[in-house]
Curated annotation (Swiss-Prot):
InterPro entries: Clx_II_MBL (IPR035680), Glyoxalase_II_hydrolase (IPR050110), HAGH_C (IPR032282), Hydroxyacylglutathione_Hdrlase (IPR017782), Metallo-B-lactamas (IPR001279), RibonucZ/Hydroxyglut_hydro (IPR036866)
Lineage: Bacteria, Pseudomonadati, Pseudomonadota, Alphaproteobacteria, Hyphomicrobiales
Keyword entries, A-Z: Hydrolase, Metal-binding, Zinc
Listed pathway(s): Secondary metabolite metabolism; methylglyoxal degradation; (R)-lactate from methylglyoxal: step 2/2
Species, as recorded: Rhodopseudomonas palustris (strain BisB18)
Cofactor mode of binding and number, as noted: Binds 2 Zn(2+) ions per subunit.
Name this polypeptide is given: Hydroxyacylglutathione hydrolase
Catalytically driven reaction(s): an S-(2-hydroxyacyl)glutathione + H2O = a 2-hydroxy carboxylate + glutathione + H(+)
Domain of life: Bacteria
Signal sequence, renumbered to the chain: none
SMART domains xref list: Lactamase_B
Family annotation (HAMAP family): Glyoxalase_2
Listed NCBIfam families: GSH_gloB
Gene3D superfamilies: Ribonuclease Z/Hydroxyacylglutathione hydrolase-like
Keyword Zinc carried by entry: yes
């Protein structure tokens, strides 16, 4: 049976995600920004937390681990390259590993750039990509620990996934991302359509996630830094993708 996925808010603008296998009863939380909303979502559904899949070591993604571990004795799965930054880790994973959540399979992709230890979890059978702070809808994460070329390569890893893959990202930043992207590609019809959709969703108080990766490939300027229209939009006609991506990210940092 397909995974059941629940989306809710943690902290100010983090997304909380539960991924449930109804056949086995196993449930994973993608990251653990804070415990209370995750425990509340579990209680609403009548689910038991069996796993936390950690994407990276930033505090707003791991702050609830200790309380959740104490409450549920769940397994904590985390990237291998993080030293002691992530607490109570039971299983460390790297590129190509597959984590079992009951009968569900989560494939690990290393996506460094935002942090050096960042990973994404891909549920191929369920067409679900949990990209955390590497790829946002119509945006990408800041480059805190890695380099711009490293982050671009990580985005390319995600871009090759199927168009019907659903993107679940780390934060509700989509409205701000759309505003910035329209300064680069104001005449992109896919971006214009996404802008209208996002405005409707936010007015209704609804999350802008999930979105389809195929739509992101057409509308997200950060995924399209190798497109001539994006290069022209930042006055770098003829420049290489890394140079264009760097300019995009630095402009977004200042916006």
């Amino acid at each position: 049976m397909a995974a059941e996925i629940r989306v809710f808010t943690c902290l100010k603008d983090n997304f909380g995600y539960l991924v449930h296998d109804s056949d086995s009863g196993a449930t994973a939380s993608i990251d653990a920004p804070e415990a209370a909303p995750i425990l509340a979502a579990l209680a609403r559904e009548g689910w038991t937390l069996t796993d936390i899949l950690v994407t990276h070591h930033h505090a707003d993604h791991i702050g609830g681990i200790a309380e959740l571990k104490q409450a549920t004795n769940c397994r904590v799965v985390a990237p291998h390259d993080n030293g002691a930054a992530i607490p109570l880790v039971d299983l460390r994973v790297r590129q190509g590993d597959v984590v079992k959540i009951g009968g569900l399979l989560a494939r690990v992709l290393e996506t460094p750039g935002h942090t050096l230890d960042h990973v994404a979890y891909v549920f191929d059978d369920d067409k679900a990509l949990f990209a955390a702070d590497t790829l946002f809808s119509i945006g990408c994460g800041r480059v805190f620990e890695g380099t711009y070329p490293m982050m671009w390569e990580s985005l390319l890893k995600l871009r090759v996934l199927p168009d019907d893959m659903r993107l679940y990202c780390g934060h509700e930043y989509t409205a701000a991302n759309v505003k910035f992207a329209l300064t680069v590609e104001p005449n992109n019809p896919a971006l214009q359509a996404r802008a209208a959709e996002v405005a409707h969703l936010r007015t209704a108080g609804l999350p802008t996630i999930p979105t389809l990766l195929g739509d992101e490939k057409r509308a997200n300027v950060f995924l399209r830094a190798d497109e001539p229209t994006v290069a022209a939009g930042v006055r770098l006609k003829g420049a290489g993708a890394v140079e264009v991506f760097t300019e995009l990210r630095e402009r977004k940092n200042k916006s």
